[in-house]
Amino acid sequence: MKIEIKDLHFTYPGGVEALRGISLTIEPGEQVAMVGQNGSGKTTLVKHLNGLLQPTSGSVLIGDWDTKKVAVAKLAARVGYVFQNPDEQLFSSNVGIEVAFGPRNLGYSAEKTDALVKDALALTELSDKTGTNPYDLSPTWRKMVALASIISMDSDIVIFDEPTTGQDALSVARIAHVVAELKRRGKTVITITHDIDFCAENFERVVALSKGQVLLDGPANEVLGQAEVLAQTYVDPPQLTRLGQRLGLKETVRNQEEFLAALKK
Protein backbone atom coordinates (compact mmCIF):
# COMPACT_ATOMS: atom_id res chain seq x y z
CA MET A 1 0.00 0.00 0.00
CA LYS A 2 1.72 3.18 -1.19
CA ILE A 3 1.72 6.32 0.97
CA GLU A 4 2.00 9.71 -0.71
CA ILE A 5 2.35 12.85 1.39
CA LYS A 6 2.26 16.01 -0.68
CA ASP A 7 3.21 19.47 0.64
CA LEU A 8 1.64 18.71 4.01
CA HIS A 9 1.08 21.63 6.37
CA PHE A 10 -0.59 21.41 9.75
CA THR A 11 -1.26 24.14 12.28
CA TYR A 12 -2.70 23.38 15.72
CA PRO A 13 -5.43 25.58 17.22
CA GLY A 14 -3.64 28.55 18.70
CA GLY A 15 -1.39 28.99 15.70
CA VAL A 16 1.42 26.48 16.36
CA GLU A 17 2.67 25.36 12.94
CA ALA A 18 3.71 21.73 13.46
CA LEU A 19 4.28 20.62 9.86
CA ARG A 20 5.68 22.88 7.18
CA GLY A 21 5.48 21.51 3.67
CA ILE A 22 6.39 17.84 4.12
CA SER A 23 6.44 15.65 1.01
CA LEU A 24 7.26 11.95 1.27
CA THR A 25 6.53 8.79 -0.67
CA ILE A 26 6.64 5.47 1.16
CA GLU A 27 6.49 2.42 -1.06
CA PRO A 28 4.65 -0.80 -0.12
CA GLY A 29 6.70 -2.98 2.21
CA GLU A 30 9.18 -0.30 3.30
CA GLN A 31 10.45 -0.17 6.88
CA VAL A 32 10.74 3.50 7.87
CA ALA A 33 11.90 5.08 11.12
CA MET A 34 11.00 8.67 11.97
CA VAL A 35 13.52 10.34 14.28
CA GLY A 36 13.99 13.82 15.69
CA GLN A 37 13.76 15.83 18.87
CA ASN A 38 10.49 16.26 20.76
CA GLY A 39 8.35 18.76 18.89
CA SER A 40 9.95 18.03 15.52
CA GLY A 41 6.63 16.86 14.07
CA LYS A 42 6.97 13.06 14.11
CA THR A 43 3.75 12.19 15.92
CA THR A 44 1.81 14.93 14.18
CA LEU A 45 2.95 13.53 10.84
CA VAL A 46 2.01 9.91 11.46
CA LYS A 47 -1.37 10.86 12.93
CA HIS A 48 -2.20 12.15 9.47
CA LEU A 49 -1.72 8.66 8.06
CA ASN A 50 -4.73 7.19 9.85
CA GLY A 51 -6.87 10.30 9.83
CA LEU A 52 -6.51 11.23 13.50
CA LEU A 53 -5.40 14.63 12.20
CA GLN A 54 -6.43 16.36 8.97
CA PRO A 55 -4.10 18.55 6.88
CA THR A 56 -4.36 22.30 7.13
CA SER A 57 -3.21 22.15 3.52
CA GLY A 58 -1.65 19.53 1.29
CA SER A 59 -2.74 15.92 1.06
CA VAL A 60 -2.11 12.40 2.35
CA LEU A 61 -2.96 9.44 0.15
CA ILE A 62 -3.12 5.88 1.49
CA GLY A 63 -3.26 3.88 -1.70
CA ASP A 64 -6.09 5.55 -3.60
CA TRP A 65 -7.74 6.95 -0.46
CA ASP A 66 -7.41 10.64 0.40
CA THR A 67 -7.42 10.77 4.21
CA LYS A 68 -9.49 13.97 4.12
CA LYS A 69 -12.31 12.05 2.48
CA VAL A 70 -12.21 8.76 4.40
CA ALA A 71 -13.42 8.12 7.96
CA VAL A 72 -10.91 7.10 10.62
CA ALA A 73 -12.77 3.82 11.19
CA LYS A 74 -12.46 2.94 7.51
CA LEU A 75 -8.77 3.92 7.38
CA ALA A 76 -8.13 1.42 10.19
CA ALA A 77 -8.48 -1.34 7.61
CA ARG A 78 -5.35 -0.03 5.89
CA VAL A 79 -3.41 1.67 8.69
CA GLY A 80 -2.89 0.17 12.15
CA TYR A 81 -1.55 2.44 14.91
CA VAL A 82 0.09 1.12 18.09
CA PHE A 83 0.09 3.86 20.72
CA GLN A 84 3.16 4.60 22.82
CA ASN A 85 1.21 3.93 26.01
CA PRO A 86 -0.76 0.68 25.70
CA ASP A 87 -3.07 1.79 28.51
CA GLU A 88 -4.54 4.35 26.09
CA GLN A 89 -5.47 1.52 23.73
CA LEU A 90 -6.62 -1.44 25.83
CA PHE A 91 -10.17 -1.71 27.16
CA SER A 92 -11.36 -5.34 27.04
CA SER A 93 -11.73 -7.76 29.93
CA ASN A 94 -9.26 -10.31 28.58
CA VAL A 95 -6.48 -10.57 26.02
CA GLY A 96 -8.41 -12.76 23.60
CA ILE A 97 -11.37 -10.38 23.41
CA GLU A 98 -9.02 -7.41 23.04
CA VAL A 99 -7.13 -8.93 20.12
CA ALA A 100 -10.36 -10.03 18.42
CA PHE A 101 -12.03 -6.62 18.63
CA GLY A 102 -10.28 -5.08 15.62
CA PRO A 103 -10.98 -7.76 13.02
CA ARG A 104 -14.57 -8.15 14.27
CA ASN A 105 -15.07 -4.40 14.02
CA LEU A 106 -13.83 -4.53 10.42
CA GLY A 107 -16.54 -7.06 9.63
CA TYR A 108 -14.34 -10.09 9.06
CA SER A 109 -15.97 -13.51 9.26
CA ALA A 110 -15.71 -15.51 12.47
CA GLU A 111 -13.40 -17.98 10.74
CA LYS A 112 -11.05 -15.27 9.46
CA THR A 113 -11.14 -13.44 12.79
CA ASP A 114 -10.20 -16.59 14.69
CA ALA A 115 -7.29 -17.26 12.32
CA LEU A 116 -6.00 -13.67 12.57
CA VAL A 117 -6.29 -13.67 16.36
CA LYS A 118 -4.47 -16.98 16.68
CA ASP A 119 -1.67 -15.71 14.43
CA ALA A 120 -1.32 -12.39 16.27
CA LEU A 121 -1.22 -14.10 19.67
CA ALA A 122 1.43 -16.55 18.50
CA LEU A 123 3.59 -13.81 16.96
CA THR A 124 3.53 -11.78 20.17
CA GLU A 125 3.97 -14.83 22.46
CA LEU A 126 0.57 -14.29 24.09
CA SER A 127 -1.09 -17.61 23.26
CA ASP A 128 -1.02 -18.70 26.90
CA LYS A 129 -2.51 -15.42 28.15
CA THR A 130 -5.78 -15.22 26.19
CA GLY A 131 -7.99 -15.40 29.27
CA THR A 132 -5.99 -12.88 31.29
CA ASN A 133 -7.13 -9.31 31.91
CA PRO A 134 -4.55 -7.06 30.20
CA TYR A 135 -4.27 -4.97 33.36
CA ASP A 136 -3.17 -8.03 35.31
CA LEU A 137 -0.11 -8.17 33.05
CA SER A 138 3.13 -6.23 33.37
CA PRO A 139 3.60 -3.08 31.25
CA THR A 140 5.91 -4.99 28.90
CA TRP A 141 3.25 -7.61 28.24
CA ARG A 142 0.52 -4.97 27.89
CA LYS A 143 2.64 -3.51 25.11
CA MET A 144 2.56 -6.90 23.37
CA VAL A 145 -1.23 -7.03 23.75
CA ALA A 146 -1.45 -3.63 22.07
CA LEU A 147 0.75 -4.89 19.23
CA ALA A 148 -1.32 -8.05 18.85
CA SER A 149 -4.57 -6.07 18.73
CA ILE A 150 -3.25 -4.16 15.70
CA ILE A 151 -1.54 -7.11 14.00
CA SER A 152 -4.82 -9.06 14.10
CA MET A 153 -6.44 -6.42 11.87
CA ASP A 154 -4.08 -7.45 9.06
CA SER A 155 -3.64 -3.86 7.82
CA ASP A 156 -1.08 -3.24 5.09
CA ILE A 157 0.53 -0.43 7.10
CA VAL A 158 1.50 -0.66 10.77
CA ILE A 159 2.69 2.34 12.78
CA PHE A 160 4.56 1.97 16.09
CA ASP A 161 4.76 5.04 18.32
CA GLU A 162 7.90 4.75 20.50
CA PRO A 163 7.65 0.94 20.69
CA THR A 164 10.65 0.40 22.99
CA THR A 165 9.86 3.05 25.60
CA GLY A 166 9.69 1.43 29.04
CA GLN A 167 10.53 -2.01 27.67
CA ASP A 168 13.22 -4.37 28.95
CA ALA A 169 15.75 -6.05 26.67
CA LEU A 170 13.66 -9.20 26.23
CA SER A 171 10.59 -7.20 25.24
CA VAL A 172 12.62 -5.09 22.79
CA ALA A 173 13.81 -8.34 21.19
CA ARG A 174 10.18 -9.50 20.89
CA ILE A 175 9.22 -6.23 19.22
CA ALA A 176 12.16 -6.51 16.82
CA HIS A 177 10.98 -10.02 15.94
CA VAL A 178 7.50 -8.67 15.21
CA VAL A 179 8.95 -5.96 12.94
CA ALA A 180 11.02 -8.55 11.07
CA GLU A 181 8.03 -10.83 10.58
CA LEU A 182 5.83 -7.99 9.34
CA LYS A 183 8.58 -7.11 6.88
CA ARG A 184 8.69 -10.73 5.71
CA ARG A 185 4.94 -10.55 5.12
CA GLY A 186 5.33 -7.47 2.94
CA LYS A 187 3.79 -5.02 5.41
CA THR A 188 4.82 -1.38 5.55
CA VAL A 189 6.16 -0.65 9.04
CA ILE A 190 6.68 2.90 10.28
CA THR A 191 8.03 3.76 13.70
CA ILE A 192 8.53 6.93 15.69
CA THR A 193 11.47 6.38 17.97
CA HIS A 194 14.13 7.99 20.13
CA ASP A 195 15.83 4.59 20.42
CA ILE A 196 18.41 5.10 17.70
CA ASP A 197 20.00 1.68 18.14
CA PHE A 198 16.61 -0.03 17.66
CA CYS A 199 16.09 2.16 14.61
CA ALA A 200 19.49 1.26 13.15
CA GLU A 201 19.11 -2.46 13.68
CA ASN A 202 15.56 -2.86 12.38
CA PHE A 203 14.75 -0.18 9.79
CA GLU A 204 16.03 0.29 6.27
CA ARG A 205 15.06 3.92 5.78
CA VAL A 206 15.31 6.83 8.19
CA VAL A 207 13.49 10.15 8.00
CA ALA A 208 14.87 12.82 10.35
CA LEU A 209 12.52 15.70 11.14
CA SER A 210 13.31 19.11 12.55
CA LYS A 211 10.91 21.98 13.19
CA GLY A 212 8.17 20.39 11.11
CA GLN A 213 10.31 19.76 8.05
CA VAL A 214 12.29 16.86 6.62
CA LEU A 215 15.94 17.29 7.55
CA LEU A 216 17.23 14.00 6.12
CA ASP A 217 15.62 11.11 4.28
CA GLY A 218 17.34 8.06 2.88
CA PRO A 219 18.85 4.64 3.56
CA ALA A 220 19.63 4.15 7.25
CA ASN A 221 23.39 3.93 6.71
CA GLU A 222 23.47 7.22 4.83
CA VAL A 223 21.27 9.16 7.24
CA LEU A 224 22.76 7.81 10.47
CA GLY A 225 26.27 8.62 9.27
CA GLN A 226 25.57 12.36 9.10
CA ALA A 227 26.27 13.26 12.72
CA GLU A 228 26.55 17.02 12.21
CA VAL A 229 23.20 17.27 10.43
CA LEU A 230 21.47 14.94 12.91
CA ALA A 231 22.72 17.15 15.73
CA GLN A 232 20.36 19.84 14.46
CA THR A 233 17.47 17.70 15.70
CA TYR A 234 19.36 16.39 18.76
CA VAL A 235 19.87 12.87 17.45
CA ASP A 236 23.15 11.03 18.00
CA PRO A 237 24.15 8.26 15.57
CA PRO A 238 24.20 4.71 17.01
CA GLN A 239 27.18 3.78 19.18
CA LEU A 240 28.65 1.43 16.58
CA THR A 241 28.28 4.07 13.88
CA ARG A 242 30.23 6.56 15.98
CA LEU A 243 32.85 3.97 16.88
CA GLY A 244 33.29 3.07 13.22
CA GLN A 245 33.80 6.72 12.32
CA ARG A 246 36.40 7.13 15.07
CA LEU A 247 38.23 4.07 13.80
CA GLY A 248 38.23 5.50 10.30
CA LEU A 249 36.10 2.78 8.72
CA LYS A 250 35.34 3.64 5.11
CA GLU A 251 31.73 2.49 5.36
CA THR A 252 29.03 3.74 7.71
CA VAL A 253 27.99 0.84 9.92
CA ARG A 254 24.82 0.60 12.00
CA ASN A 255 24.89 -2.83 13.65
CA GLN A 256 27.30 -5.45 14.93
CA GLU A 257 27.24 -7.51 11.75
CA GLU A 258 28.16 -4.55 9.55
CA PHE A 259 30.80 -3.39 12.04
CA LEU A 260 32.59 -6.74 12.09
CA ALA A 261 32.40 -7.05 8.32
CA ALA A 262 33.91 -3.57 7.88
CA LEU A 263 36.75 -4.39 10.27
CA LYS A 264 37.76 -7.36 8.13
CA LYS A 265 38.10 -5.29 4.96
Give each language-model segment a name.
Residues 1-2, 9-21, 69-71:
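A short, flexible loop at the N-terminus of ABC-type nucleotide-binding domains that lies
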Residues 111-129:
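Conserved ABC ATPase "signature" region
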Residues 50:
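Helix-to-loop junction immediately C-terminal to a conserved catalytic motif
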Residues 158-161:
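Catalytic Walker B motif of ABC-type/P-loop ATPase nucleotide-binding domains
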Residues 211-212:
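Conserved ABC ATPase "signature" C-loop
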Residues 193-194:
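H-loop/switch region of ABC-family ATPase nucleotide-binding domains
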Residues 35-37:
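The feature captures the beta-strand-to-loop junction immediately N-terminal to the Walker
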